[in-house]
């Protein structure tokens, strides 16, 4: 299970504030609200906003660290969702890597990642290949899990040192290629494991 970044008392106060605010502005009674964890919310909007109801659908979420977790696998079947795997933010840190590279490239983390993604296609293979190899040495897919080859003590300083002197577009291109390959390999493994080929995805990493 994931780690909580707030105490139980903090979470209780936050929920009370949310309910009170919505009651005051919309007039919906508080007893009609049901709180769900971050990845359940991601999975729900991905599945229930999709056209898939008959048969089984894989519902995959990937993001930074919502409620202490960074990825989940669920199965949607006949309008119902069942969580079958959760991955902690300590084990899946692709979003954090993307965040740090955004910062290293002089942009605003948690806001300008889309600019890094937009910059990536401008780099040709001979430009991004060195950066790509740096990222490949970090995390890899092992079945349905993500693992570090050799976990750096500090990801930001690790990449700052390893990527020094490389072109900015090459860094963006290498990062995007690495992330796409990593996630595609994981998705293929999930499909192979459960035999379900219909997929919906949600979360910041798959945006």
Regions found by a protein language model. Name each.
Residues 7-12, 33-36, 165-181:
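Short acidic-aromatic active-site loops that bind/stabilize oxyanions
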Residues 46-52, 185-190, 205:
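Active-site pocket-lining segments that scaffold enzyme catalytic pockets across diverse folds
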Residues 35-59:
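Conserved phosphate-binding catalytic cores of ATP/NTP-utilizing and phosphoryl-transfer enzymes
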Residues 198-207:
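Glycine-rich phosphate-binding loops at beta-strand->alpha-helix junctions
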Residues 54-58, 62-169, 173:
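A short helix-loop
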């Amino acid at each position: 299970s994931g780690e909580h970044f707030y105490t139980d008392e903090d979470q209780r106060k936050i929920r009370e504030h949310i309910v009170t605010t919505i009651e005051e502005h919309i007039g919906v009674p508080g007893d009609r609200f049901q709180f769900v964890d971050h990845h359940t919310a991601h999975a729900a909007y991905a599945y229930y906003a999709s056209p898939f109801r008959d048969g089984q659908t894989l519902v995959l979420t990937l993001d930074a660290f919502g409620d202490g977790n960074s990825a989940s696998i669920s199965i949607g079947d006949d309008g119902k969702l069942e969580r079958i795997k959760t991955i902690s933010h300590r084990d899946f840190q692709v979003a954090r890597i993307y965040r740090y590279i955004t910062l290293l490239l002089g942009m605003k983390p948690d806001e300008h990642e889309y600019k890094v993604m937009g910059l990536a296609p401008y780099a040709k293979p001979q430009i991004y290949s060195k950066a790509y190899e740096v990222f490949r040495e970090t995390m890899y897919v092992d079945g349905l899990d993500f693992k570090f080859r050799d976990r750096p003590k500090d990801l930001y300083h690790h990449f700052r040192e390893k990527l020094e002197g490389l072109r900015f577009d090459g860094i963006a291109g290498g990062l995007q290629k690495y992330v796409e390959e990593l996630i595609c390999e994981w998705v293929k493994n999930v499909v192979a494991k459960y035999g379900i080929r219909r997929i919906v995805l949600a979360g910041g990493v798959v945006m």
